[in-house]
A protein has these predicted regions:
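Beta-strand-rich N-terminal accessory domains
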Residues: 1-63, 69-78, 87
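Beta-strand-rich recognition/accessory modules
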Residues: 2-18, 114-115, 127, 200-214
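Extended, loop-rich substrate-binding clefts of extracytoplasmic carbohydrate-active enzymes
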Residues: 2-7, 82-135
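Hydrophobic residues embedded in beta-strands of well-ordered beta-sheets
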Residues: 13, 106-108, 139-141
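Acidic, contiguous internal or C-terminal segments within carbohydrate-active enzymes
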Residues: 17, 27, 114-155, 159-161
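Short acidic/polar mixed-charge low-complexity motifs
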Residues: 19-22, 41-42, 82, 124-126, ...
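Active-site/ligand-binding surface loops and adjacent short beta/alpha elements
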Residues: 152-154, 162-214
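A short, hydrophobic C-terminal helix/tail in secreted or cell-surface proteins
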Residues: 215-219
């Protein structure tokens, strides 16, 4: 297991178990995981052309959403005068992250702390830490959010994986909850009704599992 620089120009590092199992991530572009290869298969979709244009948001990989997911339905900051409105999905995905690598424990740790930049939008002192453990056939995340302020800190947190799926016929939900949150009306809805409108967004209310079966096994 080792950590090495994969693409110096783009600031991408690779965290590798072996040649068939690794992840790539970019600390300076929101700590985003750009690629996850498991047993030789690319699990994530990633738009490399868009990534090279730093004026555009990243499409693909696993962006980190903090301190909100989605948009706030307001034209001004919820924290009052003197603060900028929080951007869509928050600011974490646009900032440079710190990282460390624990070879003995076999995990990568990503850090984001409050700064002058974050306090333009969000008047709180915080530390966000994400431990990423790479295993054969799995990628595990442990998220710790530490409120260092003296008052309550409202947060949303999300991981936004883009899965590399070629055919929806091979998708299967396991233990899918009956109900979900309708994002447009902020009401409880039937999950299958909402999945038929999945392009509009759906929040499942309990844990679920999405399985994808490759139509052609790897040689």
């Amino acid at each position: 297991m080792k950590l090495e620089l994969s693409n110096k120009a783009q600031g991408i590092f690779v965290f590798r178990l072996d040649k068939n199992n690794y992840i790539k991530f970019c600390p300076e572009r929101g700590g985003v995981i750009t690629n996850w290869v498991s047993d030789g298969n690319e699990i994530l979709y990633f738009d490399e052309t868009r990534f090279m244009d730093k004026t555009k948001s990243i499409r693909g990989g696993i962006p980190i959403l903090f301190p909100i997911c989605g948009n706030l339905n307001t034209s001004s900051s919820v924290f009052g005068n003197g603060y900028l409105q929080l951007p869509q999905h928050g600011f974490a995905r646009d900032l440079q992250w710190q990282y460390s690598f624990n070879e003995n424990e076999r995990f990568l740790c990503l850090f984001l702390n409050a700064s002058k930049q974050t306090k333009k939008y969000y008047p709180f002192d915080f530390e966000l830490k994400i431990e990423v453990t790479l295993k054969i056939n799995s990628l595990e995340f442990e998220i710790t959010i530490n409120n260092k302020s003296y008052f309550a800190m409202p947060i949303n947190f999300g991981l936004h994986p883009y899965f590399n799926v070629s055919d929806f016929k091979n998708l299967e939900f396991v233990d899918n909850p009956l109900n979900c949150q309708n994002q447009e009306r902020n009401t409880i809805s039937n999950t299958w009704d909402e999945l038929n409108k999945i392009n509009l967004g759906v929040d499942l209310l309990t844990y679920t599992c999405l399985l994808y079966t490759s139509p052609s096994p790897r040689d």
